[in-house]
Curated annotation (Swiss-Prot):
Any one Gene Ontology BP term: glutaminyl-tRNA aminoacylation
GO MF, any single term: glutamine-tRNA ligase activity
Gene3D superfamilies: HUPs (3.40.50.620), Ribosomal Protein L25, Chain P (2.40.240.10)
Species name: Azotobacter vinelandii (strain DJ / ATCC BAA-1303)
InterPro entries reported for this sequence: aa-tRNA-synth_I_CS (IPR001412), Gln-tRNA-synth (IPR004514), Gln/Glu-tRNA_Ligase (IPR050132), Gln_tRNA_ligase_bac (IPR022861), Glu/Gln-tRNA-synth (IPR000924), Glu/Gln-tRNA-synth_Ib_cat-dom (IPR020058), Glu/Gln-tRNA-synth_Ib_codon-bd (IPR020059), Rbsml_bL25/Gln-tRNA_synth_N (IPR020056)
Subunit structure: Monomer.
Protein name per the record: Glutamine--tRNA ligase
Length: 555
């Protein structure tokens, strides 16, 4: 696609931060990125990372990495390690050590007691189903819990016994006492603590009660001195509760919450629950499968940190929602790799060519530039009597407009000579297994005399080329909105069965023999590829297609 028409890095938060600093409201900006460690980061998180770390960098502030680890049943150290790796890979470093909401559990417990003593929190014995019924709906007010008027002394006693482990999971909960008739349902006596007898990856078995996200979020911001607490729009209705807690607790500072529109990318799913389902049910090879929308998946596919940062800059930051075309992300990586990826040749479907009039035993060393514009040096290809071309570059009965090799026709070999197809050798089934060609020895680096050769094809030497595996990745979903499915179906019905094609027996030029994991190339005429982070080995490389040379989706 051509360069997308987008505002120049629109960001409604930038003037807010600038004004706060200029007015002296804040001496320094402090932001935070607070993921829950219950899955791998995805492309939507990249927008939040670039926003929070980017604002801090731009205005000379700091950004904390804080793990919102209040739900031990779904969290794991694997996710913590992956998140830290992904943030660093994107090019950012958090202030000091990483932080954990669980580090504040003692303080949060004390603040819960503060609310109980102030008559603003109570222990409720309603079951989850009963509490849901009492809560009401958007059109009907809720009803007060029958346990709402317990005395301060009884609530303190029950809360202490909750912590001591006397009650089973779900038997009781600590709730804030706000307003069961509030139009904003988040203010209808929200839960502060639940009983969960679960081992925690940071605190072990110290706690059997865990604070809710809403109770943890703002107070963690206050403890860390966050000035601008930036989250996505679905938390806009939670802001009154965020502020209620700050109003009613002796917090050391008062952060402010701002909301922006989350990233919605077509042909993509970013629900961590559904991404986990794809992994658990074997639809993909793992969280870092190159078809996944996870940052580790994009990394393994060959996306660069710079391309993802550029994409996030292109789409900007605003409060209006909408769906972003995945073509913008693909545009960003094409721009990056076109400028920075070394060129190489790889034949995906090798067809042997014998150049019958080329001298037996002769080998020429041909120098080809590693990049057409940047000074990256040259790579050397041996040229001799036998080479490989791609089977798709020869047609006995070509369609209209075909400019590659045909019987009696000529093409130029990239960086080499003009050859003519003289004879096609077939096996018993009629498949072409070899071409006999002749070359024009006067066409190295110049056009043939008296005729024009339009087609140029890539090639590799038969001797010296390396065998490799090439994985052709495409979009995991075949429809723009994979969440939408037929009645009774699921998003899994929209999986693109052609999202991965594995080609073995490909032949690559010698310079690719020792490609480093994650090293990126443009395979001339084929697309942009990278050596696989996990499976590629010296002498046995595996290349993943990052993106095609141009947007050909649906064509």
């Amino acid at each position: 696609m051509s360069k997308p028409e987008t505002p120049a890095a629109a960001n409604f938060l930038r003037p807010i931060v600038q004004a706060d600093l200029e007015s002296g409201k804040h001496a320094k900006i402090v932001t935070r990125f607070p993921p829950e460690p219950n899955g791998y980061l995805h492309i939507g998180h990249a927008k939040s990372i670039c926003l929070n770390f980017g604002l801090a960098q731009e205005f000379g502030g700091e950004c904390n990495l804080r793990f919102d680890d209040t739900n031990p049943a779904k969290e794991d150290q694997e996710y913590i390690d992956a998140i830290k790796s992904d943030v660093r890979w994107l090019g950012f470093q958090w202030a000091g050590e990483e932080r954990y909401a669980s580090s504040y559990f003692d303080q949060l417990y004390d603040w819960a007691i503060h609310l109980i003593e102030a008559g603003k929190a109570y222990v409720c014995d309603l079951s989850p189903d009963e509490a849901r019924e009492y809560r009401g709906s958007l059109t009907e007010p809720g009803r007060n819990s029958p346990y709402r008027e317990r005395s301060v002394e009884e609530n303190l006693d029950l809360f202490a016994r909750m912590r001591a482990g006397e009650f089973p999971d779900g038997a009781r909960a600590l709730r804030a006492k706000i307003d069961m008739a509030a139009p904003n349902m988040n203010l209808r006596d929200p839960i502060l603590y639940r009983i969960r007898h679960a081992h925690h990856h940071q605190t072990g078995d110290k706690w059997c009660i865990y604070p809710s996200y809403d109770f943890t979020h703002g107070q963690s911001d206050a403890i860390e001195g966050i000035t601008h607490s930036i989250c996505t729009l679905e938390f806009e209705d939670h802001r009154p509760l965020y502020e209620w807690f700050l109003d009613n607790l002796p917090v050391p500072c008062r952060p402010r919450q701002y909301e922006f529109a989350r990233l919605n990318l077509n042909y993509t799913i970013t629900s961590k629950r559904k991404l986990k389902q794809l992994v658990d049910e074997g639809h993909v090879g793992g969280w870092d499968d190159p078809r996944m929308s996870t940052l580790s998946g994009y990394r393994r596919r060959g996306y660069t940190p710079a391309s993802i940062r550029a994409f996030c800059d292109m789409i900007g930051v605003n409060r209006a929602g909408g769906v972003v075309d995945i073509g913008m992300l693909e545009f960003a990586i094409r721009e990056d790799l076109d400028a920075n990826a070394a060129r190489a040749m790889c034949v995906l479907k090798p067809l042997k060519v014998v150049i019958t009039n080329y001298p037996q035993g002769r080998v020429e060393s041909l120098e080809l530039p590693r990049h057409p514009k940047q000074d990256m040096g040259v790579r050397v290809l041996p040229f001799s009597r036998e080479i490989y071309i791609d089977a798709g570059d020869f047609e006995e009965t070509p369609p209209a407009g075909y400019k590659r090799l045909i019987p009696g026709g000529e093409v130029r070999l990239r960086g080499s000579y003009v050859i003519r197809a003289d004879e096609a050798i077939k096996d018993e089934a009629g498949n072409i297994v070899e071409l006999r060609c002749s070359y024009d020895e006067n066409t190295l680096g110049k056009n043939p005399e008296g005729r024009k050769v339009k087609g140029v094809i890539h090639w590799v030497p038969l001797e010296g080329s390396i065998k490799c595996e090439v994985r052709l990745y495409d979009r995991l979903f075949k429809v723009a909105n994979p969440e939408k499915s037929e009645e009774g179906g699921s998003f899994l019905d929209n999986i693109n069965s052609g999202s991965l094609v594995v080609l073995t027996g490909c032949r690559a030029e010698p310079s690719l023999a020792n490609a480093r994991p994650e090293e990126r190339f443009q395979f001339e005429r084929e697309g942009y590829f990278c050596a696989d982070l996990k499976d590629s080995r010296p002498g046995a490389p595996v290349f993943n297609r990052t993106v095609t040379l141009r947007d050909s989706w649906g064509q």
